[in-house]
Structure formats: C-alpha cells, structure tokens
C-alpha cells in the first residue's frame, strides 16, 4: 500500500508539471541580427493583389509630399524574365526602363552610393569594404538635402545590408533618420509598411537583398534568381499597399530601382550588359504615362529634388531624364 501511494504521488506530480509547462508560452523573439542566421519566413506577405491604383494624371507641376524608393539589390534588368504582377500594375501608367545604366564598378556600395549621393564611384570613393560612418560634408546624400530643406520631415532608411546606413547615408545628430539595418527582406517589407502607415515619411529608402544572394548562389537569371524576384514583387506590392492605405498615393513619387545585375556564373562588378543594365521604374500623378526612359543611377537625386520642389545640391552630378515629368516633357 505504501508503494502504491508513492506511485500515485509521483504520477500526480508529473501531471502537474506537464500542465504547468503547457501553460507557459515562450517569449516572442526579434528577427536575427547580422551575426546570426536569419530564420526562414514561414509565410508570404498578405497582399490583396496584385495591387492596382489609377492616378489622375496631370501635365501641371506637382510638388510631392513624399518620395518612397525601393532598392532591389542584384536584380539588374531581370524582372522582365519573371512573373511580377505588382511591378507591372503599379507602373503600367508610369515611366519604366529595364536598361538604365548603373555605376562602374557594378557592385553594391559603389552603385547605391552613386544613387544616394548623385556622383560617380570615382568621386565618392565608397566601396563594399567601406564601413565607417560619414558626416556627408564632402558629398551630401539625398537625405541631407531633404532633411535641410524640411527640418521637421520624417526620414527613414530600412536596409538589409547595414553598410548603406553607415558608410553611405550620413550619421549626424542634426539629421535625424530612422535607420533599421540587418533585417531579412520579409521584415524590411512588413516593418517598412508599418512605418509608412504610422509616419507618412517625407523620404524613405527600403533595400531588399535576397535577389543578390540568389544570383550569387545559383547565377543571375537562374530559376532561383527569378523566383526570388517574384517574391520581392510581393514585397513591392506590400509597400505600395501601405502607401495607398496611408492616404499617400496621390502625393507620393514611388520609385523601384536596382543597383546591378550579374552573370550566369554568379558574378558582378564588370561592364557587361547583364551586369550594367538595371531596372528603374517611377510613378506619380505628374509622371508621363506609358513612357520608357533612359537614365544613369546617379540621376536619382535630381529626380527626388525636383519631385519635392527643392534645389539640387552643388556637389551632385545628375540630370532629370527626358520625358519623365509631364510638365517638362523634353526633360531638363
């Protein structure tokens, strides 16, 4: 009988312990940092899409309240080979090219540096190994130009690759920028969309990196690379839907741009067409409909400045592309 009581007591203790464990929920975890292996997304973004929005086009001068730029690392001009309904729908009445020219060398830091600073890599000197913070006094970025023109404006940069937020975009106490770095692309999209909804930023840059990783892994233009572009197309739709939901669409210039392409062998940095040709797409009320444009990646600051109604900086070496804005159909 004594042994039976011990056995019953042990069973009761075990049952109690199991019930307590079942009631304890694990604490939620933040996305992995740059030194950790990021968790693989278990779900795709929920987008009621493909996203469609029809602008009331005008040939009058429009001063935009917002500019949102999506940078897709390593996508080059390969979107034409993938099924990307959001990209197609959003820019169906906008201006787009899949053969814009990137900077030389066709690597991430030189190219994103030229896009954000408005000068060529041989001038700004930023490489993939650059990591130290810069104050931007030598070559100010579009963030400094916009921040000084609109001191109370909300500025944000959400990037997978942290060097963009350290070595390219300024780090200054007098230039408050909401910077988020080292997140997987899925979180760049979800957290970026949330920020847009809650803050309606004047200028925001979002950087997606999965396409470049896929290109290095399986080759640029490979099935895996193109599948990754299709996934990023859903992120593009997610961000654009946030712009619509925030009531910003009619006052936002929306840009999608890539930095470089690559070879079937998974390389880039050279001057072949596969490495140098990139996507540039833009839409807004004053963007000429169904227009194919040509530009260099370092012309982006001129586009941003014109859209927001501010002067270009003297350090910039960039021009407005011909036929982009309806009020200046011949360019500037």
What kind of feature is each model-predicted range?
Residues 19-22:
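C-terminal motif of bacterial Sec signal peptides marking the signal peptidase cleavage site
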Residues 24-26:
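Bacterial signal peptide processing site
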Residues 62, 104, 132-139, 226-230, ...:
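A short beta-strand-to-alpha-helix junction
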Residues 68-69, 86-87, 231-271, 304:
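Metal-dependent active-site segment of extracytoplasmic phospho-/sulfohydrolases and closely related
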Residues 77-111:
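Short, structured active-site-proximal loop/turn typified by the sulfatase FGly-forming signature C/S-X-P-X-R
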Residues 110-118, 270-311:
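Substrate-binding rim/cap in mid-to-C-terminal beta-strand-loop elements of soluble/periplasmic
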Residues 124-128, 134-185:
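Catalytic-site neighborhoods of secreted/periplasmic enzymes
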Residues 165-175, 193-234, 238:
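Active-site His/acidic residue clusters
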């Amino acid at each position: 009988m004594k042994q039976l009581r011990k056995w019953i007591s042990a069973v009761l203790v075990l049952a109690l312990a199991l019930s307590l464990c079942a009631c304890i929920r694990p604490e939620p975890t933040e996305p992995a940092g740059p030194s950790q292996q990021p968790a693989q997304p278990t779900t795709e973004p929920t987008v009621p899409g493909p996203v469609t929005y029809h602008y009331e086009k005008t040939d009058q001068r429009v001063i935009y309240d917002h500019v949102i730029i999506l940078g897709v690392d390593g996508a080059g001009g390969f979107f034409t080979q993938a099924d990307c309904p959001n990209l197609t729908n959003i820019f169906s009445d906008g201006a787009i090219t899949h053969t814009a020219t990137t900077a030389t060398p066709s690597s991430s830091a030189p190219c994103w540096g030229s896009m954000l600073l408005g000068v060529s890599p041989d001038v700004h000197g930023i490489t993939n190994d650059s990591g130290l913070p810069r104050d931007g006094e030598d070559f100010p970025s579009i963030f400094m130009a916009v921040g000084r023109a609109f001191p109370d404006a909300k500025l944000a940069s959400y990037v997978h690759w942290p060097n963009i937020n350290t070595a390219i975009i300024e780090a200054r106490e007098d230039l408050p920028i909401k910077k988020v770095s080292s997140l997987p692309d899925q979180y760049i999209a979800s957290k970026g969309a949330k920020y847009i909804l809650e803050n309606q930023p004047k200028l925001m840059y979002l950087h997606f990196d999965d396409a470049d990783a896929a290109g290095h892994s399986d080759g640029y233009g490979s099935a895996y690379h193109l599948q990754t572009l299709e996934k990023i197309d859903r992120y593009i739709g997610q961000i654009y839907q946030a712009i619509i939901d925030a009531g910003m669409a009619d006052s936002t210039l929306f840009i999608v741009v890539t930095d470089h392409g690559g070879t079937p062998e998974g390389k880039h940095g050279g001057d072949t067409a596969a490495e140098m040709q990139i996507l540039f797409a833009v839409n807004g009320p004053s963007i000429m409909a169904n227009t194919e444009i040509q530009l260099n990646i370092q012309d982006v600051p001129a586009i941003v400045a014109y859209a927001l109604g501010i002067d270009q900086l003297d350090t910039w070496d960039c021009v407005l592309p011909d036929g982009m804005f309806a009020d200046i159909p011949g360019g500037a």
